Amino acid sequence: MTELAGMPVLEAAQGAKDQHMVINMGPQHPATHGVLRLVLEIDGEIIVRIYPKVGYLHTGIEKTCEAKFYQQVIPLTDRVNYLDPLSNNLCYCLAVEKLLGLQAPEKAEWIRVLLAELSRLNSHLIWLGTHAMDIGALTVFLYTFREREDILRLFEAVAGQRMMTSYFRIGGLAMEPPLDFFDRVQAFIRTFPEKIDEYSNLLTGNPIFRNRLKGVGILSAADAIALGVTGPPLRASGVDFDLRRDMPYSGYEKFQFKVPVSTDCDCWARYLVRLEEMRESVKIIQQALDGMPEGPIKADAPKIVLPDREKMKTQMEALIHHFKIVTEGFAVPAGEVYQGIEAGHGQTGYYVVSDGTAKPYRVHMRYPSFATLQALETMCKGRMLADLVAVIGSIDIVLGEIDR
C-alpha cells in the first residue's frame, strides 16, 4: 500500500493476503448523520485505520461574523449546531456580555437555564431516536420525535421559530414569554419522565441493542482527555466534569442536579449517561419553574439593549436608541474573552476578540463534535466494520459543528 496526501491508495496488484482494502463511508450515508466522509482502511471486516474527511458543510460562518454587528451574530450561531440552537445563543451572548461588563437580569438568567435544558432534551431526543434506528430499533425513533415535537412547539411559542430560535439577546431576552408558556412547560415535564422510562424499557433490556453497544467503542479516560473530548462521551469514560457544576454560568450554581458518570467507557455507557442526563434536565427545569423570579428580562443598558415596542411608541429617546442600535450597532470595549458552556454535545466555547468597534474583530467557535470525531479511530481500531455504525451514533456528532 502506498500513501498519497496522507491517505492510503490501493496498488494495482491484487490478491495478496496482506493487502488491506480502502473503502469510502459517506459523504452520503445515513449512519454518518450528515455529510461526513470516512476513508476506511480494513483488513477483511476489521478496521485498521479511519481517515475522517471533513469540509463538505463548510459555511465560512466565523468569517461572516466579522462583517456583522454583535447583535446580528446571534442568528448565525443557531445554524452551527442546529440541533441545540439555544445553547449556541447562550454561549455567544455570555461572551459578549463579559466584554461589555454587562449582567443580564436574574429572571432572564433563569429563563435562559430553562430553555437551555429544553434545548439539551431536544438534542438528546434526536440522538436517541437516530442512534436506536441505526441499530435497528425503529420504534424508539418514532417515540422520541413525538416528544421532540412538543419541545419544538414550546420553542415556537416563546421565540416564533421551531429550530433557528435566535431568542437570547446580549443583555437578556428578545421578549417576555407568553403568559401560558410556563404552564405548557410544566405540562410537558410532568409526563416526560414516563417517556424516558418508556425508552429505557424498549432499549435497556433489549439484548440485541445491548450486545451491539456493550464493550464496543472503548475510549479510556486518558484518551478522552488527550483528544479533547467533552460532554457525555467524556463522562462515560469516567471523567466527572460538567461546566454547569464546576464552572457555573447563567445562575447554574443555584440549581441542584447530579452529573451522570460511568466508568465502562463504551457505547453502552454513553447511552446510559445521556439517558440519565435527560432525567437531570427535567429536575433543573422543574426548579426553574418553581423558583422563577419576577422582574425585567432585559438589562438596563439603553445604548446596548433594544427597547420594548411600547416605549418606542411613546418615548422619543427610546426610538432614537433603537434607531442607532439597528443602524450603527454598539461599540464593545477592546479586548478578548473566552466563554464556555456545557451544551448537549459537550463543551461549546466562544472566543471573541473586539477592536473597540461595533463589529467583532474575530469570533472563534469551539464546538465539541470536532474533538469527538478525532477519537473515532481510537474507539474503532480493531473492531468489526459493523461496529462503526454503533460508535458513530454513540458519540453524537453534528457536522455543522465540525465544518463551520
Predicted feature residues:
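Metal/cofactor-centered catalytic core regions of large enzymes
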Residues: 1-404
